[in-house]
Every structure is written in structure tokens, then in C-alpha cells.
Amino acid sequence: MTIVNLAAYHFVSLDANEQWRPLVTARCNELGLRGTILLAPEGINLFIAGTREATDAFIAYIRHDPLFEGKFATLQFKESLSDSQPFRRMLVRLKREIITMKKPAIKPELGRAPFVDARTLKAWLDRGHDDAGRPVVMLDTRNAFEVDVGTFDNALDYRIDKFSEFPEVIDANRADLEGKTVVSFCTGGIRCEKAAIHMKEIGIDNVYQLEGGILKYFEEVGGAHYHGDCFVFDYRTALNPQLQPTENVTCFACRAVVTPEAQQSPSYVPGKSCPACPQAASAA
């Protein structure tokens, strides 16, 4: 059976999450869906999977049911297919933020940060500057272990361990961004959108987010100006610029990414350990 995997997020002011939670949970269970939906005052973030019929019904429900008062009418979904269900259960959770930055919640009603689409970004990188002649700086907003799997050429990488560290490292490194066009990017768009909004709010000029993140960039223009693969938070571990799963795997014990080269190590035992396990244990 082919399973449809859906991912979506949307920054929008929400105030009825407690009332919605049991109703959304019930509808998802009726459809046989599994995955996680996060609801917060700043918006929605979801990863769910099910049959084609079930996912189509969910999209119609979340976009058009009167319960949501049109707040998700423009919600855009990223879709991928798998041969099996990647999630064990269905959860609808209430959160303070849909992606944790530990800063005052952003105000979606004030508008999103400007974005640049994949084709325009590629043209900028081809030329070495944007349309106004400013040098372009690619800013990776992901965690260090994700960056190690692949990133844009010459991207700024501040080696953060979690997204909540982002505001602090930006405050400490603002000089890197002065006089340049800054393009924040992440896997699918949510972190780079929130990062761009934060930078805009603290007065950094000429900030853009990469529309749809790395995965949308791969879909539109392939791997131009990018080296390596893109880490994803599911059973596939990483996708190449053709959006195909790679031979990278995730260590069952320490959750590190194990490359094909590392899989040749005697310390790699599938389902038990990998070369990174001792370092992970000492850091715990």
C-alpha cells in the first residue's frame, strides 16, 4: 500500500486551540491518520501520513471546515510517498511555539518576512550578488548535525545544537551580515521563516527566507550551489538533490547520522551502535 506523507506549517494567530484539539484528534482518528499536529498561538505545524483518500479528506477538512474560520484556507502541503506508515500514532499537541525559539511569540498578523524563490536565489548565486548588487550570504538555521549532512556552498553555520540558540548567535555575529543580503534557509521553511522574522524585528536589513526551504529548492532547481544531501526528520534520514533517499542512516542508539563511509567501521552495528556513540555518551 502506498502511504502519502504530508508536511505543512503556517504562522497565523490562533486562540481556540484547546477547543480544537479534541475535534481535530477525533477527525484524524476517523480518517486513520498517524503523525503529529502542533497548535500554538502563533500557528500550526504538522507531519501526518495515511492513504491518499484519507490525506485528501484531511486537506479539505483543515482548509474548509467552518470550525477553523478560514485560518488555514491557504495552508500549503509538501507531499511525499512511502511504502509503509512512518508514524506509530496520532497526536495533536498544544505548544507555546510551533518551532521553539524561546523568544516572545512572533506576531503573524504583522506579516511574514520577505522570501526569495528557488530560481531567483539560484540566479543570485550564479552571479554572486542579488538584483541590487549586494553580496548574498546564505545563513543555515539548522542544527549542526543536520548541516554536516549537506548545506549550501559557503553558508554561514554557527554550529547551534538547537534552534532556541539562534537569537543569541545572531546577536553575537551581526557584523557578518552587515551590508549584505541575508538568505536564511532550513529543511522545509519553518525555521528559516521564523529566523527571518526575528532578524527583521531586531533591525537587520535585507533579510529573506528561502521559500519552501532546501527541499523546495531541490524540487525547483536541483543541487546547484549545494553540496551533500539534506537531513530529514523521518525514517529516510536524508534526501539527495533529486529528492531520493540516500544510504545515510540514523543510529538507533545515539541518533547520529551514519554515512555510508561510517557504516564500514567495526563500531557500526546496525540497530545497536555507531562510531559517534562514545562521543554522544560522554556529552550526555
From Swiss-Prot:
Keyword Manganese among record annotations: no
Family matches, as Pfam families: Rhodanese, UPF0176_N
Active site: C186 (cysteine persulfide intermediate)
Coiled coil: none
EC number: 1.14.-.-
Domain of life: Bacteria
Rhodanese domain mapped to chain residues: 132-226
Biological processes annotated in GO: tRNA modification
Enzyme class: oxidoreductase
InterPro entries reported for this sequence: Rhodanese-like_dom, Rhodanese-like_dom_sf, TrhO, TRHO_N
MF term (GO), any: oxidoreductase activity, acting on paired donors, with incorporation or reduction of molecular oxygen
Known catalytic reactions: uridine(34) in tRNA + AH2 + O2 = 5-hydroxyuridine(34) in tRNA + A + H2O
Keywords linked to the UniProt accession: Oxidoreductase, tRNA processing
Function: Catalyzes oxygen-dependent 5-hydroxyuridine (ho5U) modification at position 34 in tRNAs.
Family: Belongs to the TrhO family.
Protein name: tRNA uridine(34) hydroxylase
Source organism of this protein record: Burkholderia cenocepacia (strain HI2424)
